[in-house]
A protein has these predicted regions:
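Glycine-rich helix-loop-beta junction characteristic of Rossmann-like nucleotide cofactor-binding loops
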Residues: 13-16, 43, 122-125
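Conserved beta-strand elements of the Class I
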Residues: 22-25, 133
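Extended, folded domain segments that form the structural surfaces/walls around functional sites
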Residues: 35, 52-54
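Reductase modules of NAD(P)H-dependent flavoproteins
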Residues: 53, 60-172
Length: 172
């Protein structure tokens, strides 16, 4: 295993300007890159609040994300590095689109209606304070990218940090 001293790719902290609230938007297996970011002390040091949205067709597809977030509560290494209760900064917002669950609907639809913001106790994303990372299927990424830009957020890169970034690797 070769470990690099610094993370690379599009979903990295260096591609975002400083902010107060970090949003992770995922569909299906798009949750995976956020697993490492949720274990990264910098995530909790840089943001007052971390909101994770995970939209899947079926309830079972949400299990990985839910288990990971629950496991953070007992992560002794993060607690030692960041401090006890670091996980209280996290708000997890799982939704399904086909199978019945406590929260039904695509996150983009729930944002458009204002329901997601009401549920989470926030307003729409604000470019002065909110930062976002997007990882999902291509159609979702494009739709959410358009939505974030309608809120005034701009896409960033490692060489030009802004308010949001999108995963660019896709499998055929």
């Amino acid at each position: 295993i070769i470990l690099r001293p610094k993370p690379v790719g599009t979903l990295v902290h260096d591609a975002l300007l400083p902010g107060k609230r970090l949003w992770f938007f995922a569909t299906g297996t798009g949750f995976a890159p956020f697993a490492s970011l949720l274990r990264e002390p910098q995530t909790y040091e840089d943001y007052d609040e971390i909101i994770i949205t995970h939209t899947c067709r079926e309830v079972g597809e949400l299990a990985y994300g839910a288990e990971l977030i629950e496991g953070l509560k007992s992560d002794e290494l993060l607690a030692e590095v960041i401090g006890e209760g670091f996980w209280k900064k996290i708000k997890y917002y799982p939704t399904t689109t086909r199978e019945q669950s406590p929260k039904m609907g695509r996150i983009t639809d729930l944002m458009r209606s204002g329901e997601a913001f009401a549920d989470l106790g926030t307003g729409p994303l604000d470019p002065a304070t909110d930062r976002a990372m997007i990882c999902g299927n291509l159609a979702f990424n494009l739709e959410l990218k358009e939505m974030l830009e309608s809120y005034g957020l701009e896409e960033g890169a490692n060489s030009d940090p802004k308010q949001y970034v999108v995963e660019k690797a896709f499998l055929d």
